[in-house]
Amino acid sequence: IIMANREIPYKIYLEENELPRQWYNVRADMKNKPAPLLNPATHQPCTLEELSHVFCTELAKQELDDTTPYIDIPQEIIDFYKMYRPAPLVRAYCLEKALGTPAKIYYKFEGNNTSGSHKLNSAIAQAYYAKKQGLKGVTTETGAGQWGTALSMACAYLGLDCKVFMVKCSYEQKPFRREVMRTYGANVTPSPSMETEVGKKINAEFPGTTGSLGCAISEAVECATTHEGYRYVLGSVLSQVLLHQTVSGLETKTACEKYGIKPDMIIGCAGGGSNLGGLISPFMGEKLRGEADYEFIAVEPASCPSLTRGVYAYDFCDTGAVCPLAKMYTLGSTFIPSANHAGGLRYHGMSSVLSQLYHDGYMTARSVEQTSVFAAAEQFARTEGILPAPESSHAIRVAIDEAMKCKETGEEKTILFGLTGTGYFDMVAYQKFNDHEMSDYIPTDEELKVSMDRMPKVD
């Protein structure tokens, strides 16, 4: 039932029975499929058997499937989703008023769960397939800690062991998030650690390093492959993660259709691409099939600008070069970004699905500096009453910028962005901003060249 003429409420909640029953696989509608993952030793496309050494078998199948458009969500996962979904689609009336813009601003809020973000959507799926396979546990990496928290929640629910390698600078900046993980039974180690061979190697090569997501991934993969009954799971980048995250985009699309809302532009922050891919996929599918047109904008930190300044090439997904090679926009897997305050976006590469779509001109990208991001975060907090995560605030920055352009031109554009989570554990970052101690670090071309020159040569 379309209620196009009805007054649009501040928050649109779908009914429980309107929860998506299937995930949407955007690769099925892509003419140019993402390039395959390659075996790091042979440079040949990874087989199901090879991927199954690292990932759960069912997840490895999802990773390789670029033809099935819809994949059924198991009932057990739907039951878990019901604890915190459907998530609201919010009309930012208060922000619109404060900006004095004719634009209509909407955001999909994914912070309604203890992990504080969208990450739980894929954590429960990956933990479910691990449990179904009869595994003892899983290993993973986490940056700011949202993914680690989400996975520890899912593992606690299903009775699985959970081993988390947390990027050292976040481990130190965000002790409370570490404790939430431990409350859910996870074992949390700062990365790089002395528990793995790759951790020892990185510590020796970069003494005193604050770590990176790429480095934590290497440790988690090594830990999984050297312990019987364990597999590695991860919170972003891979196609399987973007697939699970489409639950958010599908809900958003249903809510929009229900109220006759047609977004002109859809904006999301992008680190590895899980939130952006999940939010835009169902809309991107329409664009790929020629049924509708939307403007898609990926927003990344200026300190880690993979889409806007990276190269499109095969690269390692991790610093230790143990993961498969992925063709993506990358700064080079040895690139260690400055210890900026959006830990969840400090990744050198980008999902191969989003990289392909960006390469083919279906979406655009912008990089923003962190002081401008926190200015947008505070404006949003003061008008909309939600304290946003630093990661999400990258999308808020561009949404506000676009709304202000509408104010100048008088256009009544409909702007939709993903509010991926809350910022309650990011108070060190907010404190730095409030104390005027936050700086904007932008890597030089020379610095980027160093890590790009060290990338693998793949014919």
Cite the ranges covered by each PLM segment:
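Active-site/ligand-binding loops adjacent to catalytic centers
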Residues: 70-72, 202-240, 248, 260, ...
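A short, small-residue-rich loop immediately preceding and capping a beta-strand
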Residues: 122, 130-169, 262-276, 296, ...
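Active-site-proximal loop->helix
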Residues: 139, 147-210, 306-316, 427-435
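Alpha-helix C-terminal capping segments
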Residues: 125-135, 149-161, 182-183, 280-290, ...
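Claisen-condensing/thiolase-fold acyl-transfer catalytic domains that form or cleave C-C bonds
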Residues: 270-278, 370-436
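Active-site nucleophile and cofactor-binding loops and adjacent substrate-binding regions
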Residues: 109-120, 138-147, 238, 267-272, ...
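Positively charged, low-complexity intrinsically disordered leader regions
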Residues: 5-135
